[in-house]
Amino acid sequence: MLRVAVPNKGSLSEAASAMLSEAGYRQRRDSRELVMVDPDNDIEFFFLRPRDIAVYVGRGTLDVGITGRDLLLDAEVEAEELLPLGFAASTFRFAGPVGDFASAEELEGKRLATSYDGLLRGYLAERGINAKVVRLDGAVESSVRLGVADAIADVVETGNTLKAAGMEIFGDPILKSEAVLIRRAGGTTNGTAKEVDVLIRRLQGVLVARQYVLMDYDIRKELVEKAAALTPGLESPTVSPLRDSDWVAVRSMVPKKETNRIMDELYDLGARAILVSSIHACRI
């Protein structure tokens, strides 16, 4: 069986399980379940702390896993990213007292508090910045006021917590993170490469289904090329004859976020009977 690590709690957990369900895999119904077997797909799911998943995968104990890119890099293990999954986006950044710092280079010789010491040490080493990293398990915003650090490196969403602590973001982002599918560096160790490929294709199908819709419309033959420029599809739109030989029916995949704009432009061009359908699953 393919052995897959899934986050058991936190912001990654619910979205990861939802995506796997959309990909056709059975998921747990009770949050207390730690292991679940899906015999129809010959796969076994292990629900683990997100921070531990990269460790289990990197050591080859489990074949693949879903975790955050930031947690993967912070673990400093022999695991690699296979596929970005498009949810749980976050940005890892520097912050310090208002007016104290303008760039990462000014951190030379300073103390930096973080919950991601592995990730931060790697970033500093790549840029030749010599700073002391102070690992904290949480609430790093308080470390400067308490005299533990001169600045911090942490995941930033709105920045409101930093402002309340009298701090501001500075420098370029350290890392832009999101949920990712990972495996042991160099591939799996138990002959499950084919099963991993199937998992990747299914997850890619979910990503495409979430990002695109199917658009159908009727248009006069002489306007097909102009219409196709608006709805090029992934390779090419499908064009079918209608009973009225002056008209054709067109079907194409279009980006979901552009649906209404494209419909308006098609209508202005002369298209009629414009319909939009959701995509529940696909293989590209």
Curated annotation (Swiss-Prot):
SUPFAM superfamilies: GlnB-like, Periplasmic binding protein-like II. Pathway: Amino-acid biosynthesis; L-histidine biosynthesis; L-histidine from 5-phospho-alpha-D-ribose 1-diphosphate: step 1/9. Its cofactor is Mg(2+). The keyword Phosphoprotein does not apply. Transmembrane segments: none annotated. Catalyzes the condensation of ATP and 5-phosphoribose 1-diphosphate to form N'-(5'-phosphoribosyl)-ATP (PR-ATP). Has a crucial role in the pathway because the rate of histidine biosynthesis seems to be controlled primarily by regulation of HisG enzymatic activity. This is ATP phosphoribosyltransferase. The lineage of its organism: Bacteria, Bacillati, Actinomycetota, Actinomycetes, Micrococcales.
